[in-house]
């Protein structure tokens, strides 16, 4: 009987290990925070349709700050030990530049367009789920009884959902004083707080898989006026047709029609399935493409899908 119970316990342990190993974890990318970039002047100007905005210059930061690369590498190792897949910024940017075949601004035949920042493009092309932002400051300190000159580091980690840009997990702390180099001091401080950070990430990702990803979905028409959302099909206005489709294809019919006119509809907090029927990860573009095909096949309505990052998509009706 004891041998039977022992065998049963061993089988249960093996099953738990297998489940832990096969549990899906989000894909991550580690980047410096806005504050870190600004404090070290790693910023640049971006022209957003005539309006100049300041954005982080990650490429210059990784190229010129050797400490940053070491810090990101150390944190990447910690996250990998928890089973996360970590994408490398420099490698992803090199791949993006090699296959750059479209402009940052996509234009229709009629001259309409959508702007996308370099960070939006990175998220869309590299397709990672969570962005880990690291910020740290170095303080002068003394070490040991002999009061040897050293330093301590206070840090903040933030996990950002790349689909919504919402902060979904945080961690902060202060290291003990040390004479080690900053990346090693920071590694120890982050490691001491990693368990809680990992728990926050795991709970959030479990919720996504159960309740769906959250995206923003915009429907609008071209200026040509070939079609509008009040046009009727089989007695229903087009906006009602689209809402019916949204109800059938979102997780538990969850979405919010925040604004609607005859030329534009804004759907927010749209919960899309985590995977499509083929078991592939679904993003905003693939979800909108399903509606585009439905409108084309059922109502002969042409439309074009435009994206901004991973979590915002625009379906423009009336032409391609």
Predicted stretch roles:
Residues 21-44, 166-254, 308-309, 320:
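C-terminal/domain-edge helix-coil "capping" segments
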Residues 23-25, 66, 70-74, 81, ...:
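Extracytoplasmic
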Residues 31-34, 89-91, 135-136:
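Active-site-proximal beta-strand/loop segments in catalytic clefts of secreted hydrolases
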Residues 38-41, 96-99, 140-145, 226-227:
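Extracytoplasmic/secreted cell-surface and envelope-processing proteins
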Residues 42-131, 236-298:
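N-terminal segment of the mature soluble domain
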Residues 130-179, 310-319:
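Amphipathic beta-strand/beta-sheet edge segments enriched in Tyr/Trp
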Residues 287-320:
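A cross-taxonomic marker for long C-terminal extensions/tails that follow the last structured domain
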């Amino acid at each position: 009987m004891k041998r039977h119970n022992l065998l049963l316990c061993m089988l249960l342990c093996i099953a738990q290990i297998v489940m832990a190993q096969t549990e899906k974890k989000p894909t991550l990318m580690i980047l410096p925070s806005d504050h870190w970039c600004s404090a070290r002047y790693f910023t640049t100007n971006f022209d957003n349709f005539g309006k100049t905005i300041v954005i982080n210059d990650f490429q210059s930061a990784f190229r010129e700050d050797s400490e940053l690369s070491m810090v990101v590498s150390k944190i990447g190792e910690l996250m990998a030990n928890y089973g996360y897949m970590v994408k490398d910024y420099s490698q992803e940017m090199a791949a993006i530049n090699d296959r750059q075949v479209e402009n940052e601004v996509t234009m229709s035949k009629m001259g309409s367009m959508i702007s996308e920042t370099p960070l939006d493009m990175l998220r869309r092309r590299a397709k990672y789920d969570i962005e880990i932002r690291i910020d740290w400051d170095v303080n002068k300190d003394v070490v040991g009884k002999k009061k040897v000159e050293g330093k301590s580091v206070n840090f903040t980690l933030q996990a950002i959902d790349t689909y919504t840009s919402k902060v979904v997990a945080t961690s902060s702390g202060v290291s003990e004083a040390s004479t080690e180099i900053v990346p090693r001091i920071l590694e120890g401080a982050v490691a001491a707080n990693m368990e809680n950070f990992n728990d926050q990430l795991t709970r959030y990702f479990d919720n996504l898989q159960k309740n769906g990803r959250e995206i923003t979905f915009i429907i609008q028409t071209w200026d040509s006026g070939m079609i509008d959302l009040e046009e009727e099909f089989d007695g229903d206005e087009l906006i009602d047709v689209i809402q019916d489709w949204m109800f059938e294809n979102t997780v538990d019919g969850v979405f919010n029609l925040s604004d609607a006119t005859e030329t534009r509809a804004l759907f927010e907090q749209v919960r899309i399935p985590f995977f499509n029927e083929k078991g592939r990860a679904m993003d905003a573009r693939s979800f909108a493409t399903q509606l585009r095909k439905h409108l084309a096949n059922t109502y002969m309505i042409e439309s074009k899908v435009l994206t901004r990052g991973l979590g915002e998509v625009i379906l423009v009706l009336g032409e391609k």
